[in-house]
Amino acid sequence: MEGDAPQRVSERVSGPGPGGGGGGMIRELCRGFGRHRRYLGQLRQNLRETQKFFRDIKCSHSHSCPSSPAGGGAAELGPAGDVAEAPLPAGQLSCIAFPPKEEKYLQQIVDCLPCILILGQDCNVKCQLLNLLLGVQVLPTTRLGSEENCKLRRLRFTYGTQTRVSLALPGQYELVHTLVAHQGNWDTIPEEDLEVQEDSEDAAHVLAELEVTMHHALLQDVDIVVAPCQGLRPAVDVLGDLVNDFLPVITYALHKDELSERDEQELQEIRKYFSFPIFFFKVPKLGSEIIASSTRRTENERSPLHHQLMDLGYLSSSHCNCGVPGQDTKAQSMLVEQSEKLRHLSTFSHQVLQTHLVDAAKALNRVHCHCLDIFINQAFDMQRDLQITPKRLEYTRKKENELYESLMNIANRKQEEMKDMICETLNTMKGELLDDAANMEFKDVIVPENGEAVGTRELKCCIRQIQELIISRLNQAVANKLISSVDYLRESFVGTLERCLQSLEKSQDVSIHITSNYLKQILNAAYHVEVTFHSGSSVTRMLWEQIKQIIQRITWVNPPTITLEWKRKVAQEAIDSLSASKLAKSICSQFRTRLNSSHEAFAASLRQLEAGHSGRLENTEDLWLKVRKDHAPRLARLSLESRSLQDVLLHRKPKLGQELGRGQYGVVYLCDNWGGHFPCALKSVVPPDEKHWNDLALEFHYMRSLPKHERLVDLHGSVIDYNYGGGSSIAVLLIMERLHRDLYTGLKAGLTLETRLQIALDVVEGIRFLHSQGLVHRDIKLKNVLLDKQNRAKITDLGFCKPEAMMSGSIVGTPIHMAPELFTGKYDNSVDVYAFGILFWYICSGSVKLPEAFERCASKDHLWNNVRRGARPERLPVFDEECWQLMEACWDGDPSQRPLLGIVQPMLQGIMERLCKSNSERPNTGLDDST
């Protein structure tokens, strides 16, 4: 193969002291980069599965995503993870997508492999640092020319089964070029191969890097790049070439006591364009021995290098005098001037790699959590849609029918009233109408002032205008009377009916938005009677017939003159000829006709609207099931993995202490210290199948999403142990707050009545908080109530805790505390009230002895059947009457009859005040061990 050459094993570089460039440091570096490779693989796998998840969402629900921009878009996240998308309508999940910025950033992180970049004050010191890192003399350190004349090309060291040297263009192809190293054995790479020859005219040869493959443990997980001399390519350009494909761990080799002006300029350029920390290491002079401790600087002294780097912004006041940063885990620049402390490079590289992985894991987990929240909110919206839409349709039908019947009753009832009202109006307004008619000025008619007669056409026009005046005044009076009769309807339910219709039509196509129009027509029949008169109605035509008779009676052979008396006479004849009873009958008849027509059209359009909703609700229910059964659990597991990766990177895997207890799905251990929390309890859960994995992941998401509350046990974090039980299984380690004991143990030891009632109040407060967050615990029992050293209670084990919209009706919980409706699969948060009632029985009894009704049951099935038939705990002689009534109310068989916890809490406070604060409490037989 081209480039292979015989070589001798290079001489091993003697370390500068214990922990220096020897095997210990190399092993630490290997472990650090190997750990990064494993965690990067986990991140890469999680990202791939997340991308597949979003692709599946898009493919399976693309039909439900609207094409309009208003339909929603990708769930965008801001720099801090804030939401930047518009809310999605219920059921439109295909619009949920991987935010492009986050996806691009994460893809770049997982594609970038680590690389150690060696910069330095000159090429000799860079080569010397490379030899120290590898522990072998690979590069010459004394034969290279001065920095001014140096032509050192870029060097890349990678892993290979054989040592091999070749020239290659970075990231492209290998050059066919004969090297000195190919011509014989060598201890170190020949200087001629390291430098760009001055007489070289081949541009590719000048740009090429020397690639060295070696069988070395460190190179298995990380490449090492030695930057070329500054004359060939500035360090900032070299770094710019690397950052697109590699994650650089930057080292800067020093051999002088101070930075030169050129060094400072180079470092300023790097800091200007990049934010990477740098590991500054002062390489010992060749052949020098370890400096005696007596000649070292005292701890309070800072070297000139330290001051210069502080001025450049690389070091801060938090760094100790040796240049090592404080306890902050975020990567910071580091200065090491003692050669035996080169081992700090492993700490520095760990911080650099960890910072990038943690940031990536956080970004990925933000995407997971944000989309999970969207799913849960969508589940709530879909569940509400499924519940409320049929009720809205029924309400609309009922209320419209009530409106129709009310208006019809008004039309029937008001006919006689309207007749009397018309007569009364005519009598009241007669004088005013005659005066108005006498004084009116005609439009479009020229009346001679000298008393001359007018033509027949002008006469008819004048008579028509007088008639219109009378009719308009009568119209207004009738309309006002009718409107006042139905004002109550608008105030009572018309507004609610309109809003209900609007909500039903909102999710439907515009073409069927006619139901509201028919409702408006029903209302127009009552509110806009005047429009009927002006639009050529039957009433108007009837009036015109009467007016024609008037015209015939008052028309003479010779046309009259238009005088005040004539106008009064015309108006009088018109008023006298009007029949109040016929007018009232005609008005009400027309009102009923319009009502019937609009009512029938409304009913037909409502049936059409109901049919459209029926198909939509069927699709919504299918989608709701997919969200609960597939989408949310699948994404929750990815979220659990990304969050666990973040936790293990920041805090490492916790150490298991002594076993504290065992449950149905896990073992609880003592954990002394983790993530700054002390002491902790660690619950190890080995999910036996996919369903349990999903349930655990959702539980974790709900717990992490909850704000901290003093009545809930804090969850500090999680770690996935892929080698649990010697590698036989995968376990999820949940690290949480450790408390003193559980309520079961507390009752066995003995607690005073006041303490027990306070515990009951604490439990109610905790359950109320869960319900306020939309969660149902579903497993309230003695073992899931923990007590601190002051005997204050906290609720734990949210394993069965779910939002109401995410509950599938599965039968879960502890049989004794399970409400009867749990067996039907249809239940709500009132099951927690039932469970509290049973818990309160134990609290009031002061013992853990089973109730007789439950103790007689031979099996779970027997117990469940008895509970369904109404079996409940018995009343004990020690029970207070009010306490017993509260228990009975809480475990009522009808969920709707159980009291709300907002009512239970003040009742408990009153009981506690009465029994404990009034000094009327009898001495408790149990022991009070609250300490």
UniProtKB/Swiss-Prot annotation:
It catalyses: L-seryl-[protein] + ATP = O-phospho-L-seryl-[protein] + ADP + H(+); L-threonyl-[protein] + ATP = O-phospho-L-threonyl-[protein] + ADP + H(+); L-tyrosyl-[protein] + ATP = O-phospho-L-tyrosyl-[protein] + ADP + H(+). The gene is DSTYK. GO terms for cellular component: anchoring junction; apical plasma membrane; basolateral plasma membrane; cytoplasm. One of its GO terms (biological process) is positive regulation of kinase activity. CDD domains: PKc_Dusty (cd13975). Acts as a positive regulator of ERK phosphorylation downstream of fibroblast growth factor-receptor activation. Involved in the regulation of both caspase-dependent apoptosis and caspase-independent cell death. In the skin, it plays a predominant role in suppressing caspase-dependent apoptosis in response to UV stress in a range of dermal cell types. The active site is at residue 779. ATP binds at residues 660-668, 683. PANTHER family: DUAL SERINE/THREONINE AND TYROSINE PROTEIN KINASE, DUAL SERINE_THREONINE AND TYROSINE PROTEIN KINASE. Residues 1-24 are annotated as: Disordered. Keywords: ATP-binding, Cell junction, Cell membrane, Coiled coil, Cytoplasm, Kinase, Membrane, Nucleotide-binding, Serine/threonine-protein kinase, Transferase, Tyrosine-protein kinase. The keyword Flavoprotein does not apply. This is Dual serine/threonine and tyrosine protein kinase.
